[in-house]
Design a protein with these regions (language model features):
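Conserved N-terminal phosphate-binding loop of PLP-dependent enzymes in the Aspartate aminotransferase
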Residues: 2-6, 31-506
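Ala/Thr-enriched low-complexity intrinsically disordered regions
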Residues: 24-26
């Protein structure tokens, strides 16, 4: 089983299949009644003939792929893009093919490609220095740094978390969140005294007590990044972890819910109870092993691992367990954050009485970082640090993105468009149960299972040939990660195309 899984990933068959396109043409879609953005855009971009396919005889993509592969392994590359011509929900490749993008750079495009408001922002003379000069924010921040943080990230700070540290990506956000948790936990144990001489000396040779043997509890199927600490908590695909040394940290089972939910209420409650019991057992077990669990990390929806959901009650009880055992509760909102579930942060759906202790973000937030409670504040400079600590130009862009989200009510749009998408997927499941099962989602953060990875990959390939970009996750799931400007008519457009694909699928 393990060798088969590894062989599949080493072969990268899924990535390769993206490039084996065959000429196909979907009829152009006249979208003159619906602009690429809610905000007016230049006339040439108003109507995007979204699904037209122009398979040119001399394909630029093949040449570019060969060039890139000379200098690095390019097997993961799906295709090369023309971002100058991409607008709104439509991505254009280097050969001129326009596609409805329902994957949006692995869920990292908040308000569509080349949004006119963002283009206008970067053209304003007073903003030029912010894009040209990238400061070492930890020691030499710009004069307006605090102001821009208040206008951007702090304006959407999750409940109970007043402290903020910016980073560049999701992995470094989680990695430094782990460090923050370990320092907080050791400070609790140390009390008021400072560092001992023994601690200062032993930490330099990676030994206790200077380097205590703490752990972070994670869940099977999780994905939290590819750096060393994050990789120890990532359990989605073997190819991510093979050959890399790691830590002996506890891994709990994540609920595997049965669908439709309303037909398996009792079974799903029992499944969640089983997983929660295992969490507590592992915390006790690792305490006895002298590998104390300092924190628990969890995704609101396991994304890379297969879009695995759990009930709001599961997360409330998980938070209670963390508090009971003195563990920090870390919520990874790298992929779920930014509004795609219908709330700005997916964990807001849970209704926690006691907020999470730490929450990481990236992707749609255009920068990385983490919010945390006051008690997790580092007690000395340089303990959480790197050269750039993010990028102030991204805070400038994010402030405008948040303004647009609020002005155009894009959170409610995500909820409504997501309902249209989910309803349509349920209808397709009823009509084609041999291809679609376990339809699930929150907002536009939707997915379904296919019979196996071969069928999944083939469906994604055919969809791209018909002008739609989809993403895979887990062993056999297809996931949807559209932008926040994904509207009802985009959902209907996709559903019509995918219905035809399923009708002809063999």
């Amino acid at each position: 089983m393990a060798s088969m899984l590894l062989a599949r990933h080493l072969a990268c068959s899924f990535q390769h299949s993206y490039r084996l396109l065959v000429p196909a043409a979907a009829p152009p879609v006249n979208c003159s009644h619906c602009q690429c953005f809610h905000t007016p855009v230049p006339k040439k971009s108003d109507c995007y003939n979204a699904m037209s396919r122009h398979f040119l005889e001399k394909r630029k993509e093949d040449a570019l792929m060969k060039q890139l592969n000379i200098i690095q392994n390019a097997e993961a590359v799906h295709f090369f893009c023309n971002y100058e011509e991409s607008r709104g929900n439509y991505l254009v490749d280097v050969d001129g093919n326009r596609m409805l993008d329902l994957y949006s750079q692995i869920s990292s495009v908040p308000i569509g490609y080349s949004h006119p408001a963002l283009l206008k922002l970067i053209q304003q003379p007073q903003n030029a220095s912010m894009f040209v000069n990238r400061p070492a924010l930890g020691i030499l921040p710009p004069e307006n740094f605090v102001e821009k943080l208040r206008e951007s990230l702090l304006s959407v700070a999750p409940k109970g978390m007043s402290q903020l540290i910016t980073m560049a990506c999701g992995s470094c956000s989680n990695e430094n969140a782990f460090k923050t948790i370990f320092m907080w936990y050791r400070s609790k144990e140390r009390g008021q005294r400072g560092f001992s001489q023994e601690e200062l000396e032993t930490c330099m040779i990676n030994q206790a007590p200077g380097c205590p043997d703490y752990s972070i509890l994670s869940f099977m199927g999780a994905f939290h990044g590819r750096t060393m600490g994050c990789l120890a908590t990532t359990h989605s695909k073997a190819i991510h972890k093979i050959d890399i040394p790691s830590f002996d940290w506890p891994i709990a089972p994540f609920p595997r819910l049965k669908y439709p939910l309303e037909e398996f209420v009792k079974e799903n409650q029992q499944e969640e109870a089983r997983c929660l019991e295992e969490v507590e057992d592992l915390i006790v077990k690792y305490r006895k092993k002298k590998k104390t669990v300092a924190g628990i990390i969890v995704e609101p929806i396991q994304s890379e691992g297969g879009d695995n959901h759990a009930s709001d009650d599961f997360f409330r009880k998980l938070r209670d367990i963390a508090r009971k055992h003195g563990c920090a509760f870390l919520v990874d909102e790298v992929q779920t954050g930014g509004g795609c579930t219908g709330k700005f942060w997916a964990h807001e759906h849970w209704g926690l009485d006691d907020p999470a202790d730490v929450m990481t973000f990236s992707k749609k937030m255009m920068t990385g970082g983490f919010f945390h409670k006051e008690e997790f504040r580092p007690n000395a400079p340089y303990r959480i640090f790197n050269t750039w600590l993010g990028d102030p130009s991204k805070n400038l862009l994010l402030a405008e993105v948040i303004n647009i989200i609020k002005r155009e009510d894009l959170l409610n749009n995500a909820a409504h468009a997501g309902k249209v998408l989910l309803t349509g997927l349920l209808d397709l499941q009823a009509r084609y149960p041999q291809f679609i099962s376990r339809v699930r989602g929150r907002g536009t953060f939707c997915s379904f299972d296919t019979p196996d990875d071969s069928i999944r990959n083939k469906l994604i390939l055919i969809a791209r040939n018909k002008g739609v970009v989809l993403g895979g996750c887990g062993d056999k799931s297809i996931r949807f990660r559209p932008t926040l400007v994904f509207r009802d008519h985009h959902a209907h457009l996709f559903l019509n195309i995918f219905s035809d694909i399923l009708a002809d699928f063999k």
